[in-house]
């Protein structure tokens, strides 16, 4: 209650007058609306009265005001950072060091703008002491970690068929460098200590976006026939049905939304294969929400999959292709390897407080390769002109490559889902 004192002196020849004023005052503040009560005013000759007004004891929400929009968070992922020898050479500096920043110079702004940015780090980062190398046994300099972080990536997926290319030393060097230099970065798929592996009882990685808890898992089909160290059976997260099911179920207990990043499929195939379909079913049955696939080195379709028993829906990106590469292959189909995709998925909460996908799509990316220092980089297709396409040295390996070729490939594989803005 509040009080308003009004001093009124009315000389009305001894006559008293009483006046009642009823007024409905509505005050709006965001979604809150309050209505004042009746205001009573009394006046008497040569007298002073206190006028009292009452407000409602409780402020009630308006039934006709829309609720505030739930926050949205954008997740992006790009495909394989595949450092063939000419890619490494383009990043070699005059003093013998390596600087990989040029690979990300045309895409880092959008990568950094995402709320959560993931990348498939195809090759192990074992450091220069083990020898920098391209295909078939890859190894990158530690400075690649610096460039990945500088580009804005938050999650590094290392479970690939090349994780053991430099043996135990390469994997341990890579894991230690990430942990020592960038503890804020989530590194998935490889382990130099058992404590970080779900196969040894660790919980899945959980990332918080506002009030959302996002679990992210990363697996590979294999390691090119290279055995894991006998004393480190946990070194690489492999696609094992029992382990994957347990991991996803645990993730569902701990998180609001589960992402799985599998390294799977058939190289250079533009459609999913039987193995991918098998694993998709397993992921859906156990409650995964989003699949972001890599390994084929070309783009593959995007589709919703529904588990028949639970009717749970899951969005699948079968393959994001290469983020950057300079394959040594020649002939028909090589041009396909120069097209990759940035998955774009927006999450929000529905009226029940459940995290769901509010929007999704994909932005095509082009590996642009030319000889010389900093001659290799990646562009979004929307920024890639026909003139740039003509300068791309990949035309010497596959003459069919052109901007139009890339557009037609995206249309063929992704239909209307690919975005240019």
Regions found by a protein language model. Give the residues of each.
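Positively charged n-region of N-terminal signal peptides that target proteins for export
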Residues: 1-4
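C-terminal motif of bacterial Sec signal peptides marking the signal peptidase cleavage site
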Residues: 12-14
């Amino acid at each position: 209650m509040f009080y308003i004192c009004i001093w009124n002196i009315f000389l009305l020849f001894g006559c008293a007058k009483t006046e009642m004023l009823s007024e409905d005052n509505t005050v709006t503040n965001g979604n809150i609306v309050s209505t004042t009560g009746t205001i009573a005013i009394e006046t008497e000759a040569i007298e002073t009265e206190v006028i009292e007004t009452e407000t409602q004891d409780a402020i009630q929400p308006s039934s006709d005001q829309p609720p505030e929009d739930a926050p949205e968070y954008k997740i992006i992922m790009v495909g394989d950072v595949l450092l063939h020898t000419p890619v490494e050479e383009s990043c070699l500096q005059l003093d013998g060091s390596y600087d990989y920043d040029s690979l990300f110079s045309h895409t880092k702004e959008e990568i950094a703008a995402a709320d959560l940015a993931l990348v498939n780090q195809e090759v192990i980062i074992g450091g220069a002491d083990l020898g920098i190398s391209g295909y078939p046994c890859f190894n990158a300099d530690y400075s690649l970690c610096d460039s990945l972080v500088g580009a804005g990536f938050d999650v590094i997926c290392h479970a690939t068929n090349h994780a053991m290319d430099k043996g135990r030393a390469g994997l341990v060097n890579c894991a230690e460098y990430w942990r020592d230099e960038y503890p804020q970065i989530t590194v998935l798929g490889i382990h130099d200590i058992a404590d970080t592996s779900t196969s040894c009882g660790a919980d899945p990685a959980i990332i918080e976006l506002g009030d959302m808890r996002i679990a992210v898992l990363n697996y590979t089909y294999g390691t090119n026939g290279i055995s894991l160290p006998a004393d480190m059976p946990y070194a690489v997260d492999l696609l094992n049905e029992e382990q994957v099911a347990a991991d996803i179920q645990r993730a569902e207990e701990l998180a609001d939304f589960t992402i799985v990043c599998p390294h799977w499929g058939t190289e250079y195939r533009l459609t999913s294969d039987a193995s991918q379909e098998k694993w998709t079913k397993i992921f859906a049955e156990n409650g995964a929400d989003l699949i972001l696939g890599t390994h084929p080195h070309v783009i593959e379709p995007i589709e919703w999959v529904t588990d028949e028993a639970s009717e749970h829906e899951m969005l699948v990106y079968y393959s994001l292709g290469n983020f950057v590469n300079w394959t040594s292959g020649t002939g028909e189909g090589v041009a396909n390897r120069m097209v990759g995709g940035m998955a774009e998925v927006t999450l929000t909460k529905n009226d029940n407080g459940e995290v769901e996908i509010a929007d999704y799509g994909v932005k095509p990316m082009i590996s642009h390769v030319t000889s010389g220092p900093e001659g290799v980089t990646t562009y979004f297709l929307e920024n890639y002109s026909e003139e740039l396409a003509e300068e791309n040295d990949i035309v010497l390996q596959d003459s069919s490559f052109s901007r139009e070729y890339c557009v037609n490939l995206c249309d063929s594989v992704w239909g209307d889902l690919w975005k240019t803005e």
